[in-house]
From Swiss-Prot:
One Pfam family in the UniProt entry: DUF494
PANTHER family reported for this sequence: PROTEIN SMG
UniProt-recorded name of the protein: Protein Smg homolog
Source domain of life: Bacteria
Originating species: Methylobacillus flagellatus (strain ATCC 51484 / DSM 6875 / VKM B-1610 / KT)
Family named by the database record: Belongs to the Smg family.
Amino acid sequence: MFEVLVYMFENYFESDIHPDHETLSKELFAAGFDQEDINGAFDWYSALESMSEESDAQLGTAGIRIYSEAETKRLSADSLSFMMFLEQAKVLTPAQRELVIDRAMALSQPEVGLEETRWIVLMALWNQDKANDYLFVEDAMFNDNRPTLH
């Protein structure tokens, strides 16, 4: 499913091409993706869109996020560090962080690594029209140097 999401983002959403659901489904199937993964990606992205609209509510910024056991098992240490880096850099708000965590946990794979987390952050910020933040994340995604946390 994750590969379908990345393909959709790179080929359609990033370029503001938004074919209807049926056309996109046919194109993804023709590109070699499994129908179950296509449907899962559509559901995942629909949830991202609806949650993005709701995530405007501000969470307190002074708190510390304690991750559940399920989250620490699924999300790699690099993923958690990357989200902390983005939050400390004021790229992600606490509400956006929660959105990213939710969407990461909704993936069908057993572990979510740094690459997947970067893509989820990218999609979430892009979906919320955070162009400048998006550019920062895109640079972080394709720059092999990891951010230094102090």
